[in-house]
């Protein structure tokens, strides 16, 4: 690997590390949480999605374990960045979705990340 490619790779790492520390300090979130939040925006913005279905999709798309996904989802719900509701017909079924407040917080968070990264 030549020096230029190595420097580019190191630059990516520094940017990744800086972003990780920034969102942890400011929002108490991880990069996994951001990835899950972005995926929920793509799949749960317009309708409530069954948690099991979302987990399968997220495991495939994000290549994260079920445990890590559940931790991120729980954290996002606690931070009121994602909403959930239990089915009235079957208590075992849980749906996740983004309400208008969640979407506003999503947009503000990702605008802040864009400013931090200068993109």
Curated annotation (Swiss-Prot):
Its main location: cytoplasm. It is found in: Cytoplasm. One of its GO terms (cellular component) is cytoplasm. Keywords: Cytoplasm, DNA-binding, Repressor, Transcription, Transcription regulation, Virulence. One of its GO terms (molecular function) is DNA binding. It comes from the Bacteria. One of its GO terms (biological process) is regulation of DNA-templated transcription. Induction: Transcriptionally activated by MgrA. Expressed maximally during the stationary phase of growth. Signal peptide: none annotated. Residues 55-78 bind DNA. Belongs to the SarA family. Involved in the regulation of virulence genes. Acts as a repressor of the agr locus and consequently targets genes regulated by the agr system such as sspA, hla and hlb. Binds directly to the agr promoter region. This is HTH-type transcriptional regulator SarX.
């Amino acid at each position: 690997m030549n020096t230029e490619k190595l420097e580019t790779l190191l630059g990516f790492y520094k940017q990744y590390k800086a972003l990780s520390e920034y969102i942890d300090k400011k929002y108490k979130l991880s990069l996994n949480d951001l990835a899950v939040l972005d995926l929920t925006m793509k799949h749960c913005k317009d309708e409530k999605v069954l948690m099991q279905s979302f987990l399968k999709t997220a495991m495939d798309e994000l290549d994260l374990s079920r445990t890590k996904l559940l931790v991120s989802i729980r954290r996002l719900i606690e931070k009121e960045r994602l909403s959930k509701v239990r089915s009235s017909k079957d208590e075992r079924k849980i749906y996740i979705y983004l309400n208008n407040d969640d979407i506003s917080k999503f947009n503000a968070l990702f605008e802040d990340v864009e400013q931090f990264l200068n993109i």
